[in-house]
């Protein structure tokens, strides 16, 4: 039996990351904490870039969030 394939809504992922960053942290600060550029983070938050596993893991570790939550919004 093949596992089901799920489409990832990158716009929703970007919105969750933007919400996680909040209004008290700049994109530059957030990007620095996860090891990416501010311009890359900006594109991610707008859903224009897909995010690799390494970056998702860095966000999860740094901000104590599960990969499931980052990708689906469900804990």
Feature locations, PLM:
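A short, Lys/Arg-rich alpha-helix, primarily the initiator
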Residues: 1-23
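Residue-level signal for the short linker/turn that defines the boundary of a DNA-recognition helix
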Residues: 15, 24-25, 51-54
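Residues within the helices of the helix-turn-helix
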Residues: 18, 28, 57
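Short alpha-helical DNA-recognition segment
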Residues: 23-46
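Key DNA-contact positions within bacterial/archaeal DNA-binding proteins
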Residues: 39, 49, 68
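DNA major-groove recognition helix of helix-turn-helix/homeodomain DNA-binding modules
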Residues: 54-69
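Short amphipathic recognition helices of helix-turn-helix/homeodomain-type DNA-binding modules
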Residues: 69-75
């Amino acid at each position: 039996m093949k596992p089901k394939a799920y489409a990832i809504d990158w716009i929703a992922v970007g919105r969750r990351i933007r919400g996680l960053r909040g209004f008290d942290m700049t994109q530059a600060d957030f990007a620095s904490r996860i090891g990416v550029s501010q311009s890359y983070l900006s594109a991610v938050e707008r859903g224009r870039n897909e995010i690799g596993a390494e970056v998702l893991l860095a966000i999860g570790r740094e901000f104590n969030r599960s990969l499931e939550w980052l990708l689906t919004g469900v804990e």
